[in-house]
Amino acid sequence: MSERVVAVTGGHGVLGRAVVQAALDAGLKVAVIDHATGQTAPDGVLEIGGVDLTDAAQAQGAVDRVVAHFGRLDALLNIAGGFVWQTTDDVRPAWDRMFALNLTTALNASRAALVPLKASPDGRIVNVGSAAALKAGMGMGAYTASKSAVHKLTESLAEELKSTSVTVNAVLPSILDTAQNRADMPDVDPAQWVAPADLAAVILFLASPAGRAMTGALVPVTGRV
């Protein structure tokens, strides 16, 4: 069993569950930080539910609980987020929600984790951006703008932390192969999409000591799309 401790935000979503399982399979100690409550986590996982990561104080409290429980934190995996398709003539509610769910959660969790991550010999932050943010399509304005902001947060924070042991990177997936996406796009071949477990494997590499040479990277994980 590794001594490394990872905190996974949004750990009860489709991707979050895949990341948690990959971390457990790698022998890591895992904490799940999620807005949901009453969820069942795998054995040995520290479950911290009911956390609104758009609130900086709640984010700090959750990270403090992880450190109090395990005595350390080595990697923060910012999986929490959301998606909406909405055109710009009615975008305001979606705009605010996407920036809150995708950007503010990552910012607050990262700020809360900086002290313990700097104390780790191999501190890691991994964010989830989006390949769609590189060239937005119709109805994707709010979502891709928020993910573009995640990309820039990743690059900026990586520069700020270059003198420390902490690396900051982001994965940029295309379409994830989920039940919801299959239902929404029944005429598209899902074999070309990205399996959550495959994306989780890339995230776990970036979160590992082996990823020490990479920081500020925006890593496309696009399958065959």
Q: How should each PLM-predicted stretch be described?
A:
Residues H12:
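Conserved glycine-rich cofactor-binding loop
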Residues K135-G141, S163, Q192:
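Active-site loop immediately N-terminal to the catalytic Tyr-X3-Lys motif
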